[in-house]
Design a protein with these regions (language model features):
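Flexible C-terminal active-site loop/helix
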Residues: 1-12, 28-30, 36, 280-344
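Metal- or metallocofactor-binding catalytic centers and their adjacent structured scaffolds
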Residues: 7, 33-106
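Short Gly/Pro-enriched turn/cap motifs at secondary-structure boundaries
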Residues: 19-24, 329
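Conserved, mostly hydrophobic/aromatic
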Residues: 31, 37, 95, 108, ...
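Hydrophobic faces of well-ordered beta-strands that scaffold small-molecule active sites
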Residues: 40-42, 123-129, 148-152, 175-179, ...
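Predominant activation on well-ordered alpha-helical scaffold segments within soluble catalytic domains
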Residues: 58, 62, 96-101, 165, ...
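Metal-dependent enolase-superfamily TIM-barrel catalytic cores that perform enediolate-based chemistry
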Residues: 113-222
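Catalytic alpha/beta core domains of metabolic enzymes, predominantly
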Residues: 210-303
Length: 344
């Protein structure tokens, strides 16, 4: 068994602005797990919000991850590799994704079947409109024409209302708002009431993760549901935040493994919380992996691959606004032949 990797720069259709940052590109790492003439593939999309860096990921991979000897066993291999990954959740997810892909290819089954899902009922995915020049909103809304739900990034108090008004000039589609920790309590109380008049479905992560008491207070007065993102990393977080939020946003790159994502779903259901499946800006590789879990959640925000113009993989599609999984075993993802630099 061996592990290989490639660094790849994904380029965005538009500058991607949120409350705390703005980017035109992101570097990711594609990892390959090779054994018995089968290649499992995974994606690592590190986030500086969680103190992750591409340099640390590459350093670990370059210096070598020790692999178990003998016949491949999924559980033993994962338990052997996991402690070596320095708690970098995105790297954990990339390796875990490659292991699941390898296992599915070996057994001739798609990932969702390995997880016990027989006939997945795929949800609608939202399409993200990031913070940017107000003059570009019309273009972005037009690009989002196939999607019935928009996720609009807010978190800049001087612009927030103008952004929503501008979106509403072009469409009456349902809006989900993501403030990315950009508000304070007084402003959020005002915005929740104001947004309720603009066909907004819910608000995601209004405050910094360390302001849980503010979220608890807001929830008592908000006419809109409140979802956790930065407060909802792993399953252990859910019991802590359940009285402050109505729902959670699960992202594979945050939680570190398919198993942990499923644990989060189970715990959220136990507390009667709503569940959204989200993503970072990723290629179709990572988005397809997440889509195999989409049957288990209430709504999806799996559009990271739609926001880039050099996606090197072919995987999940969107048909009439709904996610549609590819055929094939494992993740079912194929390399686009235009991007031969990612071939082994």
């Amino acid at each position: 068994m061996e592990i290989d990797y490639r660094i790849y720069r994904i380029k965005l259709n538009h500058s991607f602005g949120i409350s705390r940052s703005k980017n035109d590109w992101y570097d990711i790492v594609i990892v390959y797990l090779i054994y018995d003439d089968i290649v499992g593939v995974g994606e690592v999309a590190p986030s500086t919000r969680y103190n992750e860096s591409i340099e640390e990921v590459v350093s670990l991979l370059k210096n070598g991850i020790k692999l178990p000897e003998g016949i491949f066993d999924y559980q033993k291999t994962w338990e052997y590799i996991y402690p070596q990954l320095n708690g970098i959740k995105a790297l954990e997810m990339g390796i875990n994704m490659a292991l699941w892909d390898w296992r599915g290819k070996k057994e001739g089954k798609p990932l969702y079947q390995l997880l016990g899902i027989k006939n997945p009922n795929m949800p609608i995915t939202s399409y993200t409109i990031a913070i940017g020049d107000l003059n570009t909103i019309g273009t972005k809304v037009e690009e989002a024409k196939p999607y019935s739900v928009l996720k609009v990034k807010l978190g800049t108090p001087k612009l927030d209302k103008e952004i929503i008004k501008e979106v509403r000039r072009f469409t009456d589609k349902v809006i989900r708002v993501d403030a990315n920790e950009g508000w304070d309590l007084d402003y959020a109380l005002e915005m929740c009431k104001w947004l309720a008049e603009y066909n907004v479905e819910f608000i995601e992560q209004p405050f910094p993760a360390n302001k849980l008491n503010q979220t608890f207070k807001l929830r008592q007065y908000s006419p809109l549901d409140i979802y956790a993102d930065e407060n909802s990393i792993i399953s252990d977080d859910i019991a802590i935040i359940r009285d402050a939020f109505d729902g959670i946003n699960i992202k594979l790159m945050k939680c570190g493994s398919i198993e942990e994502a499923i644990d989060m779903i189970k715990v959220a259901r136990m507390y009667d919380m709503k569940i959204m499946l989200g993503c970072m800006v990723e290629t179709s590789l990572g988005i397809t992996a997440a889509s195999h879990l989409a049957d288990l959640v209430d709504c999806a925000d799996l559009d990271g691959n739609l926001l880039i113009n050099n996606d090197p993989f072919i995987g999940v599609k969107v048909v009439d606004g709904k996610l549609k999984l590819p055929g094939g075993s494992g993740l079912g993802v194929e390399l686009n032949n235009k991007y031969s630099e990612l071939k082994l």
